[in-house]
């Protein structure tokens, strides 16, 4: 056998050739990113919405809107509210193996969840709320062991809540409300911080591990037990066991003697009966007197003309007070009453009911609203707002519009556009009532009131100041809500952005209110002087609102958040030195001493640079020239870059 040896020169040539061959092969990371890119393009083809403006000429998807990459892999896909529709096909998520955050919320996606979602085993945050997914919650979800946040609310999922959720041992948020789930809730021993199963056909008792959540986590179900009412078997007091047979207790003779001794005479019994009758009569008499007083008080409150005369001019976020007492009005005053104190005439029976939007659960009607107790929350630009308490768990806000001069058909067309707005940073409009003399809007009640009240309320001793984390989260939430409004079309704007129209949930999530109302009311109601300090300089006609005007108003709110100063209090002379001009007049190196709210400085020593950048953004938004102001989408992007996602953002789904 012959053995051939290559000369040194031949070996060198071979080594170079092999090296070049290896270099010409695609790197594994490049292959993976290409697979991610292919998967994203497949998703676009299947369910593409209006904002899929991806530049497919780019070889890397990492610069596409909503896509985030790390180490040359797609790790986050955020496409909320971009009109995605249809079923998600199999084979997409099988390639997105490094995905950690997936947000497809507030779209129109339907069908069942794809089975290959389980291959995205690194998923930590999954936001699918506000779609049309149906069928049972798939078992594939329970293999995502790293999942921390899961939101499947407001879909059409059916079946029971699986005990497979117990596999998700890191889960802190589970939202399943507004589906069609049935059966009982399994005992979920999980480190949950947020949990909600409201508006489902659930029954049985609430497991012990979930009883730590408040009652609003279980609304509109047939569940029982803490924190809701006791279950029937818990209410029943077990009777004492009786002895069987005819056995005579050993102490029967002694008990017979006691019975004789304790037996009451006829006179004593008669005295007791007479005393009870007299006592009962006194109680009835007292109740009649109290009811008469209450009836008189209520009838006075229902007199709409009296209420009109007494309602004071107050900011929209404060309560109306007379002689130190909050006006207590029935919902008849807050609801379907006419301007002359009589029921609306000539409008037909159709005007005598509340009209609910979309698939909103009709948990009450106009009669319930009329019977509810209510109180005046405040009088704002578009009318008076009331808090109506329907029952122990249902509280709504009713806005009684003024100066609405339009026909039923036109009002219906415009208000249905408002009711169709659906975003987590907007106060949802649940229902409306229309008659010749009354126009009412029913919203979710926001328990924390407005940003204005929180910023400018009691600033004395005992006040809990807002730290920078909360303020910046409020700012981003409000910006997202306004950006959503603007995304509905170039002609869609708010027209009345101010801190009293930014309402807050218990967890200080911002929700923009009063959107879409500027086009409903007359010019007298939208007098621009009512928005002193927030109005863009080019706005002279309150009916001609614009998106650039909204950006200006939002910039004022942003400066208000950082300075702690109310814009209406910043006018120093007849020329109107408003808040933006005052901030601009202060040199940047003096902002810490002159501009920043002193409450912030005592709490946020590490975030002053971020605060300064937010001030700069507020000044950009309040440019005197509309064309120099950024779009709200750009404002949101800049704010998110300034304030990276934190744990609190994730808990509140700021994705």
UniProtKB/Swiss-Prot annotation:
Phenotype of null mutants: No visible phenotype. Probably due to the redundancy with other receptor-like kinases.
Phylogenetic lineage: Eukaryota, Viridiplantae, Streptophyta, Embryophyta, Tracheophyta
Residues covered by the Protein kinase domain: 371-646
Ranges that cross the membrane: 269-289
Gene name tied to this protein: RKL1
Region described as Disordered: 234-260
Subcellular location: Cell membrane
LRR repeats: 71-95, 98-120, 122-144, 146-169, 170-192, 194-215
Coiled coil: none
Protein family membership: Belongs to the protein kinase superfamily.
Assigned keywords, A-Z: ATP-binding, Cell membrane, Leucine-rich repeat, Membrane, Nucleotide-binding, Phosphoprotein, Receptor, Repeat, Signal, Transmembrane, Transmembrane helix
The name this protein goes by in its record: Probable inactive receptor kinase At1g48480
GO CC annotations on file: nucleus; plant-type vacuole; plasma membrane; plasmodesma
Gene Ontology MF terms: ATP binding; identical protein binding; protein kinase activity
Domain of life: Eukaryota
Upregulation: By not induced by salicylic acid.
Polar residues: compositionally biased ranges: 237-249
């Amino acid at each position: 056998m012959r053995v051939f040896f290559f000369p040194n020169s031949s070996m060198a040539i071979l080594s170079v050739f092999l090296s070049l061959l290896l270099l010409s092969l695609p790197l594994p990371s490049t292959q993976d990113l290409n697979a991610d890119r292919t998967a994203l393009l497949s998703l676009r083809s299947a369910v593409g919405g209006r904002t899929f403006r991806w530049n497919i000429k780019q070889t890397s998807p990492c610069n596409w809107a909503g896509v985030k990459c790390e180490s040359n892999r797609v790790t986050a896909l955020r496409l909320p509210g971009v009109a995605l529709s249809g079923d998600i096909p199999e084979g997409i998520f099988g390639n997105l193996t490094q995905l950690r955050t997936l947000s497809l919320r507030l779209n129109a996606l339907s069908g069942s969840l794809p089975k290959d979602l389980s291959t995205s085993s690194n998923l930590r945050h999954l936001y699918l709320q506000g779609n049309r997914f149906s069928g049972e919650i798939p078992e594939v979800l329970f293999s995502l062991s790293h999942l921390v946040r899961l939101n499947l609310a407001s879909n059409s999922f059916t079946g029971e809540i699986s005990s497979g959720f117990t596999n998700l041992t890191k889960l802190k948020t589970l939202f399943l409300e507004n589906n069609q789930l049935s059966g009982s809730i399994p005992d979920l021993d999980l480190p949950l911080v947020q949990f909600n199963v409201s508006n489902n056909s659930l029954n049985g008792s609430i497991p012990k591990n979930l009883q730590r959540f408040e009652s609003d986590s279980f609304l509109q179900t047939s569940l029982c037990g803490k924190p809701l009412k006791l279950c029937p078997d818990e209410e029943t007091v077990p009777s004492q066991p009786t002895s069987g047979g005819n056995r005579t207790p050993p102490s029967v003779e002694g008990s017979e003697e006691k019975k004789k001794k304790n037996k009451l005479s006829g006179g004593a019994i008669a005295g007791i009966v007479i005393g009870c009758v007299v006592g009962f009569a006194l109680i009835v008499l007292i109740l009649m007197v109290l009811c008469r007083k209450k009836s008189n008080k209520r009838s006075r409150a229902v007199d709409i003309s009296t209420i009109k005369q007494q309602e004071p001019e107050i900011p929209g976020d404060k309560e109306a007070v007379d002689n130190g007492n909050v006006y207590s009005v029935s919902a008849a005053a807050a609801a379907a009453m006419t301007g002359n104190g009589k029921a609306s005439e000539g409008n037909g029976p159709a005007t005598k009911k509340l009209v609910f939007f979309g698939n909103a659960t009709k948990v009450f009607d106009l009669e319930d609203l009329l019977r509810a107790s209510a109180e005046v929350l405040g009088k704002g630009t578009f009318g008076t707002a009331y808090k109506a308490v329907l029952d122990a768990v249902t509280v709504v806000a009713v806005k009684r519009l003024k100066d609405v001069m339009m026909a039923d058909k036109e009002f219906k067309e415009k208000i249905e556009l408002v009711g169709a707005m659906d975003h987590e940073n907007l106060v949802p409009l649940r229902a409306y009532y229309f008659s010749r003399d009354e126009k009412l809007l029913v919203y979710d009640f926001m328990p924390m009131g407005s940003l204005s009240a929180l910023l400018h309320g009691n600033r004395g001793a005992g006040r809990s100041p807002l730290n920078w984390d909360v303020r910046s989260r409020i700012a981003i939430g409000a910006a997202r809500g306004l950006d959503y409004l603007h995304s509905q079309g170039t002609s869609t704007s708010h027209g009345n952005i101010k801190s009293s129209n930014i309402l807050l949930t218990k967890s200080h999530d911002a929700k923009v209110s009063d959107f879409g109302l500027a086009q409903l009311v007359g010019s007298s109601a939208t007098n621009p002087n009512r928005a002193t300090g927030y109005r863009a300089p080019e706005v002279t006609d309150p009916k001609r609102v614009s998106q650039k005007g909204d950006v200006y108003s939002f910039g004022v709110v942003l400066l208000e958040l950082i300075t702690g100063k109310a814009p209406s209090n910043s006018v120093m002379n007849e020329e109107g030195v408003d808040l933006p001009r005052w901030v601009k007049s202060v040199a940047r190196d003096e902002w810490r001493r002159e501009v920043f709210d002193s409450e912030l400085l005592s709490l946020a020593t590490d975030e002053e640079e971020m605060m300064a950048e937010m001030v700069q953004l507020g000044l950009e938004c309040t440019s005197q020239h509309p064309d120099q102001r950024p779009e709200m989408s750009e404002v949101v992007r800049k704010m998110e870059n300034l304030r990276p996602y934190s744990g609190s953002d994730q808990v509140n789904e700021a994705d």
